[in-house]
Amino acid sequence: AGPSTGMPTKPEQADLEHVLYTSQGDSCRVVFAPANVREAYDQTRKAFELAYSYNLPAIVVYDQKIQGELRTVPVEFFDREPTAGMEGVLTEDELAEAAHDASGNFMRYRHDVEDGGNPRSIPGQTGGRHLVTGNESQEVGHISESPDNRKAQMDRRMRKLTSIREDLDEMDSSHQTHYGPSEATHGLLVWGSQQDTVFEAVDRLNARGESVKALGVSD
């Protein structure tokens, strides 16, 4: 089963390759592949937060198994503060203090942002004017083919991934699940909703005298 085989939403490990690498050029993205309903809820919230904060696509890989699954989750699991909206958007007061060029244009794509995620303005804000193009741009947004600018912009984008990884590792749950004995001869790596299936296989193999453990990864 897999894409374009008549069962397009069935789980398949190869789907991850498509999600990770289908793009034009070297671009940044975040991919979540929840293993169960709890992770789907947590990671959907986190995906919106990261997409706004770091200005990049955040993809949550749901499939038929999770969508059709019936699972009991304690109501206390959902008892949490709402996620703040529009992370990374500057207020007009903050824009007044932000960097602008000599013509008063907001430097939307500054090279020196520490975490790589440039704060942004939204249309109509005073002091937020800048240019948006589909090509590589310099700090205000004008198209630039300068090698130095290109390197600086790509370095900035790559810093996003380092910052996001640190952000995810600081979460209460890392969504990396170890299963089986702490020491084993063989290891299995699985992502997404097929995690429980692989964990069951680990139990069966160990019951037969094999030495197997597994790691489920979903972010």
Where are these regions (language model features)?
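Glycine/charged-rich beta-loop-alpha catalytic/anionic-binding loops adjacent to active sites
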Residues: 24-30, 180-182
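Active-site/ligand-binding-proximal alpha/beta "capping" segment
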Residues: 27-49
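Short gly/pro/ser/thr-enriched loop/turn and capping motifs at secondary-structure boundaries
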Residues: 2-5, 39, 67-68
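Conserved structured core elements
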Residues: 10-13, 37-41, 151, 192
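Short beta-strand segments
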Residues: 1, 33, 59-63
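Flexible, low-complexity linker and terminal segments
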Residues: 43, 48-219
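Glycine-rich, flexible loop/turn motifs
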Residues: 12-15, 28, 139, 175
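Flexible glycine/proline-rich, aromatic-decorated loop/lid segments
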Residues: 1-26
